[in-house]
Amino acid sequence: MKPTAYFCMEFAIHQPLKTYAGGLGFLAGSHFRAAKRLNQPLVGVSILWSYGYYDQLRDREGKMKVEYIRKYYDFLEDIKLKVPVTINNNTVWVKAYKLEEDVFGTCPIYFLTTDIPENDDFSRTITHNLYDANNILHIAQQIVLGIGGYKVIKECENVKLFHMNEPHPLPLVFKLIEEYGLEYTREHTVFTTHTPLPEGNETQDINLLKSMGFFGNVDVKLAEKLGGNPFNYTVCALRVCKRANAVSKKHKEVCDRMWSWVKDRCEIVAITNAQDKYYWQDPVIREAAKKYDIDMLRERKMELKEILFEEVADQTGKIFKKDRLTVVWARRFTAYKRPHILLHDEMRLLELLKKKRIQVIWAGKPHPNDHNMIATFNWIVSKTRDMKGATILTGYELKLSKMLKQGSDIWLNTPKLNHEASGTSGMTASMNASIHMSTLDGWHVEWAKMYPDDSFTIGDGVRDDDAYVANCIYNLLEEVADMYDTERWWMKACNCVNHIVEYFDAERMAKEYAEKLYK
């Protein structure tokens, strides 16, 4: 592969480094761990968020509370480099820090900040919060990542290819056009799209972008020719880049249909997401499954459930039992993922909790300005407060995510059909003998086809209303509860652990990026 700079708004590397919000960051983190082991010439560019995404805490009544707590790190190297970018006709200084390879076992990553004394108050706030709801700050963040990141890479590295993971760093391509022309840019940029719906692809008023410096010194007429007006980031990236990739086979089919009208667009290839088994998988579970040692697997799973249930008790005052089937719904809290679905028929759920001895845990972070989803989170808090065997946890970050995946028995995934480009949380759960139960969307389409006996599929993949999906889940859970903790269950778990890493480990993904995108 060509030496490549990988630009991404977020990286989930390790619990102490709060530079991520969700799946995009989890994917980038796993990619960089695998690429390091494979000795791939990959370097990352991201932003050092002063306050991270946000800290998810509880108020006095136990409801979710958003807090912004400044983060400090002593493991990032100050490389003594500041580069200027122009935002709103104002010079903003961007300072770079470097995460060296040996700190967390990744390829190197440069983290950028504007939160330094050389900048005015507004400029300092640009890198305060990941995915800031203020649109002006949001665009400014993209300029810092794209143009500031390019200038840092130009000073520090010798790369031959620029990869945009999502089109957030799109100002990068206009900087390349400005310096080298459109044809050079087309030969030296690639990008990854993660969005299966047209409305999920970012658009902005082209004159606003021009006034903010998004296009640098490139003529706005060329920008409009590439991205239209309103300016569509993904359309522009498809026209400017050498190649693009979707993040699952189904997502590629969706993208080819969705963007069939775009003239002169690049090829879209499929590279299905994956996760790093060496970070996410418990080594004892790996060993037990490999030997098909059911007693060893069961014993370790019970130990991991105890660890998870200590966290449950600490947060909620509820005592969960390790001999009960434990179902977890945990991921980014957003409407299309349907976190509410298990409570669609409350009486059916109560019956499962009582008669089938099932336990349920929710966790996940809504966007701090998504008041509807924060209300949904708090509705689940109130619904489960007096519900024995059901609860919801706060603080869904890498540490808790790993704890939930290792301590659960069923990993529940309920996206609306054709809304999930890939998803990855179920991969890492499956690596830890937590069996995936999902609607037929995203990566699950491939997993269910490869090994239909290693997961549970919700519904027929056609009907998708909440009542139908909820009823399918309740019926499945009734069957699964009867199977749980039998020899058949643990054999299924062993197969799941062994088979998932054949295709959904990050080393396969990193090799495919090298072969299909970075060639």
Swiss-Prot record:
Pfam families: Phosphorylase
One GO term (biological process): carbohydrate metabolic process
InterPro entries found in the cross-reference section: Agluc_phsphrylas, Glyco_trans_35, Glycogen/Maltodextrin_Phosph
Recorded superkingdom: Archaea
Gene Ontology MF term list: glycogen phosphorylase activity; pyridoxal phosphate binding
Family statement drawn from the similarity comment of this UniProt entry: Belongs to the glycogen phosphorylase family.
Protein name per its UniProtKB record: Uncharacterized protein MJ1631
